[in-house]
């Protein structure tokens, strides 16, 4: 009879290597138990809160004829409201992406007195009711306001006098610049809070290594920093745009609500509801939903391409 060995049949090192191997995606193995229950609850919650209300909006429009639908969503007044809503939202999101990046950079990289106060002020648009924000902005930027009393004449002589920017208007409050101002105010935190964690993980040694290799500041920004920040910057841009597109409370006070000039689509939807035109309001809501989803989908695809291109 052969002697019984005290050593195990398998090498412990081989067993450890097997345990340490990552589980490939789609293998059916889950680290946490209850995946089926969690997935079912997620689908139920998403359907109850998001899909069912949106489906109801689409079903409401199915009761309209094509002539009624086109008359409701393609009138001259509605098309002007589309241009104001989408145009002002894109401009506000672009401004937030630019200045939000600078603000996040300063808050992360430069210690200065009062930095915590400034960091807390970034979240103020989250906590402040939008109606209060609209009233405050109107009081500040109106013709007789603290800021508007000296800024509006300067605006008329500079920006308002340029031929290519005459569509903005010759004043701030009660015109299109006021709409952009309100949307910029409520969307800034989305960009700053999205970029801050990425900037905190970005090591300053990358900039030092770039400078050591002879790169200029502009080359360091465009070839080192921006590729790292691009996905987060696009995410912040998309969130800011989506938030601005559905904004109502702050814009209604500072825009003046002039049809074909400063009227936004959410205000037009409220107007139709007050007139008991539920089908017309639902049709506008569906167009806004499809349009905003298409823009956000394009931004997400661009963000995905940016991440893949950066990895390559």
List where the protein language model places each region:
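Membrane-water interface segments at the C-terminal ends of transmembrane alpha-helices
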Residues: 31-65, 72-200, 224-249, 253, ...
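The alpha-helix within a helix-turn-helix
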Residues: 210
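A mid-sequence, solvent-exposed acidic-amphipathic segment
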Residues: 218-222
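Glycine/proline-centered hinge or cleavage motifs at structural transition points of membrane proteins
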Residues: 213-214, 227
């Amino acid at each position: 009879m052969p002697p019984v060995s005290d050593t195990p049949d398998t090498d412990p090192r081989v067993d450890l290597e097997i345990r340490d191997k990552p589980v490939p995606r789609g293998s059916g193995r889950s680290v946490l138990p209850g995946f089926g229950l969690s997935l079912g609850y997620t689908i139920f919650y998403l359907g109850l809160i998001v899909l069912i209300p949106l489906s109801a909006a689409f079903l409401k429009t199915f009761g309209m004829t094509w002539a009624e639908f086109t008359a409701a969503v393609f009138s001259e007044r509605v098309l002007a409201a589309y241009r104001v809503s989408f145009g002002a939202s894109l401009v506000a999101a672009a401004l937030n992406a630019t200045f939000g990046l600078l603000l996040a950079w300063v808050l992360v990289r430069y210690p200065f007195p009062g930095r915590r106060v400034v960091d807390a002020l970034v979240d103020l648009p989250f906590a402040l009711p939008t109606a209060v924000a609209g009233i405050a902005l109107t009081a500040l930027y109106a013709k007789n306001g603290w800021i508007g009393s000296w800024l509006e004449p300067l605006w008329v002589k500079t920006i308002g006098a340029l031929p290519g920017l005459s569509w903005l208007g010759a004043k701030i409050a009660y015109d299109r610049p006021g709409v952009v101002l309100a949307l910029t105010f409520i969307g800034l935190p989305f960009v700053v809070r999205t970029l801050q964690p990425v900037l905190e993980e970005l090591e300053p040694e990358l900039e030092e290594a770039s400078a050591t290799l002879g790169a200029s500041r502009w080359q360091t920004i465009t070839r080192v920093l921006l590729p790292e920040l691009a996905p987060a910057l696009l995410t912040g841009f998309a969130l800011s745009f989506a938030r601005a597109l559905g904004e109502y409370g702050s814009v209604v006070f500072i825009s003046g609500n002039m049809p074909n000039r400063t009227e936004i689509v959410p205000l037009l939807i409220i107007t139709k509801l007050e007139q008991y035109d539920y089908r017309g309001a639902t049709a506008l809501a569906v167009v806004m939903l499809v349009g905003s989803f298409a823009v956000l989908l394009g931004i997400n695809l661009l963000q995905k391409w940016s991440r893949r291109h950066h990895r390559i």
